[in-house]
Amino acid sequence: MKKYWRLFYLIFSSELIIAQNYVDILKLNLSTTPYNKFDTSSSKTKINQLDADVTIPIKLNSKLTLLSGFLYENFQTKLFADGPVKNFGSIALKLGLNKTFNEHWIGTMVLLPKIASDFVSRSSNDFQYGVVALMKYKKADHLNYKFGMYYNSELFGPFFVPMVGLYFLSENKKFEANIMLPLNADANYKLTKFLNAGINFNGQIRSYHLNHVTPSLPHTYVARSTNEFYAYLRFNFSESMMLQTKCGISVARNFRVYEENDKVNFGLPATFIGQKRQQLNSDFSNGLIFQASFIYRVNFNKNK
């Protein structure tokens, strides 16, 4: 068993991971909502969502780690009050490097090519290209600061997200905070060996190519924007396997459909620069979100 863990440590450990003492190899999320009313009619729709995040870091040497994996997401919801339920989503590859410069500074760059569409047919508009560049300053074993930039070639135009955050673990290892604003934030407290309670924030702006969303609209895209706030319980079946049950609420949520060529010059998290686009559908209300998450984690606390 000791030989097994030593091999696993050599494959998966890096300065990026050791700062947190674990790596989440698999995260699987299943979400649903109650019915949400459209603004312009009595029609209602649910939002069903499935996400998977697989991460495989491979240590090349003491200072360099290869980062690989993939992201998958699928949505089922109405985009038009009088329309059918539409399926759309994305598949993205993760390929990057993590470089340790010295005992304090660590850099990470990850390429994120993806297909984002309804997968009805294939075209160049299905493809998007993203990159994340991140620097981390390790203040102590339990504290580091992070800053960087995310870019993606969204269908509405180039999208830039400056990022800043931190990771903190209390000395008794009961309180943990992992923050990367404006994209996500998480804080949790270990109540018992088997149970953590926490709060979580996720903010996203993404776009997906649509084919024939209605008979009169053959070439469009949907821009999804949401801010989600959750409270959750995490059940720790073992050091590796966990289940989270989350209840949350969405703020400023929308799934807005635009003509394929209706774009802006570029976008930032809080604004878009360029001409005002013509929204083709109506929004529906914010509301509750229920989510269950399975996590498979490799923890190095006891195996160094």
Predicted regions mapped to residue ranges:
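Outer-membrane beta-barrel "beta-signal"
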Residues: M163-Y167, L233, D283-K304
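Membrane-embedded beta-strand positions of outer-membrane beta-barrel proteins
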Residues: L26-L30, L66-F70, M109-L111, Y145-F147, ...
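Residue-level signature of outer-membrane beta-barrel architecture
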Residues: I56-I58, K99, Y137, F168-S170, ...
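Short glycine/proline- and aromatic-enriched beta-strand/turn motifs that initiate or cap beta-hairpins
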Residues: A19-L79, I295-K302
